């Protein structure tokens, strides 16, 4: 009887020690994750000011373009035989909440209205999501973006590739991007980019003093495309960095809560193990008497 009880005590103690080791391992893992998320939050906070400067700088050119087309009364062309082109802008990086999936959702909603539209994906995140649901619409994609604030040189190269792909042949070109509403929120937005034909047919285009140049409307389209992509990428980058900072802040808080819970559980389990061992020692001593 005594031998059987001893074996039971050993098994019970082993289980308690195993549970303690599991809790301790889990606790160390969560603490390491908390260190990573706190570091990523600091990095995102540092990059946010640079992203805001890039956004404000790029936005000035976009506002100048918008004022020109407003004064020219430019509108997209209506041509049933031609397709629309959607330029969807995200980045290659994740760990920033639902910012990429929200943009992909907005693009999918647009594709329900214009199912024959072509899509150019800028960034691996939107490309990956659209490949799963709308692979037939995806014309081509760019990656290696979103690591730093965009530059005009970078967006000019992207715009040139899109133009080489026949952007001038579409009746309407639209850019979809994440617009930072505040430091805590964003929303997917879209804006048109008017092609050369739409510019030439603007009711008030003739009011502007323009040198005799047959390619001026095409030059305007190409320059505007680069500007609008730059502004959208800069705003999207600022929204992403802000979203990543918020996501890492929430992750750090959640990790802190889990650390507190597991610390309490560890201490209670350790206390229970010590109590059980004392009971076993006292019981064993009583049996010997």
Curated annotation (Swiss-Prot):
UniProt entry keywords in alphabetical sequence: ATP synthesis, CF(1), Hydrogen ion transport, Ion transport, Membrane, Mitochondrion, Mitochondrion inner membrane, Transit peptide, Transport
SUPFAM superfamilies linked: ATP synthase (F1-ATPase), gamma subunit (SSF52943)
Listed InterPro entries: ATP_synth_F1_ATPase_gsu (IPR035968), ATP_synth_F1_gsu (IPR000131), ATP_synth_F1_gsu_CS (IPR023632)
GO molecular-function terms, A-Z: proton-transporting ATP synthase activity, rotational mechanism
Family recorded in the similarity comment: Belongs to the ATPase gamma chain family.
Subcellular location: Mitochondrion; Mitochondrion inner membrane
UniProt topology in membrane: Peripheral membrane protein
Subunit structure and binding partners: F-type ATPases have 2 components, CF(1) - the catalytic core - and CF(0) - the membrane proton channel. CF(1) has five subunits: alpha(3), beta(3), gamma(1), delta(1), epsilon(1). CF(0) has three main subunits: a, b and c.
GO cellular component terms, A-Z: mitochondrial inner membrane; proton-transporting ATP synthase complex
Biological role: Mitochondrial membrane ATP synthase (F(1)F(0) ATP synthase or Complex V) produces ATP from ADP in the presence of a proton gradient across the membrane which is generated by electron transport complexes of the respiratory chain. F-type ATPases consist of two structural domains, F(1) - containing the extramembraneous catalytic core, and F(0) - containing the membrane proton channel, linked together by a central stalk and a peripheral stalk. During catalysis, ATP synthesis in the catalytic domain of F(1) is coupled via a rotary mechanism of the central stalk subunits to proton translocation.
NCBIfam families: ATPsyn_F1gamma
Main location as per UniProt: mitochondrion
Protein name (Swiss-Prot/TrEMBL): ATP synthase subunit gamma, mitochondrial
Outcome when changing residue 275 to A: In MGI5-1; converts K.lactis into a petite-positive form
The encoding gene: ATP3
Gene3D superfamilies named in the record: 3.40.1380.10, ATP synthase, gamma subunit, helix hairpin domain
Taxonomic placement: Eukaryota, Fungi, Dikarya, Ascomycota, Saccharomycotina
């Amino acid at each position: 009887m005594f031998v059987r009880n001893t074996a039971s005590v050993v098994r019970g103690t082993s289980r308690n020690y195993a549970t303690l080791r599991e809790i301790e391992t889990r606790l160390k893992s969560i603490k390491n994750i908390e260190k990573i998320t706190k570091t990523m939050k600091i990095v995102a906070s540092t990059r946010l000011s640079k992203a805001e400067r890039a956004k404000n700088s790029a936005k000035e050119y976009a506002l100048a373009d918008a004022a020109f087309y407003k004064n020219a009364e430019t509108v997209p062309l209506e041509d049933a035989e031609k397709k629309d082109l959607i330029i969807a802008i995200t980045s290659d990086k994740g760990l920033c909440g639902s910012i990429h999936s929200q943009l992909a959702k907005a693009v999918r909603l647009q594709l329900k209205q214009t199912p024959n539209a072509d899509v150019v994906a800028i960034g691996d995140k939107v490309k990956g999501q659209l490949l799963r649901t709308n692979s037939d619409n995806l014309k081509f994609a760019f990656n290696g973006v979103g690591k730093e604030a965009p530059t005009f040189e970078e967006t000019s190269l992207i715009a040139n590739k899109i133009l080489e792909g026949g952007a001038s042949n579409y009746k309407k070109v639209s850019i979809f991007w994440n617009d930072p509403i505040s430091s805590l929120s964003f929303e997917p937005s879209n804006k048109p980019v008017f092609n050369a034909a739409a510019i030439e047919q603007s009711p008030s285009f003739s009011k502007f003093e323009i040198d005799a140049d047959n390619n001026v409307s095409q030059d305007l389209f190409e320059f505007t495309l680069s500007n609008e992509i730059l502004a959208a990428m800069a705003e999207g980058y600022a929204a992403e960095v802000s979203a990543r900072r918020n996501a890492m802040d929430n992750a750090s808080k959640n990790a802190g809560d889990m650390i507190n819970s597991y610390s309490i559980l560890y201490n209670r389990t350790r206390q229970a193990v010590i109590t059980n061992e004392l009971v076993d020692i006292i019981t064993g001593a009583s049996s010997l008497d």
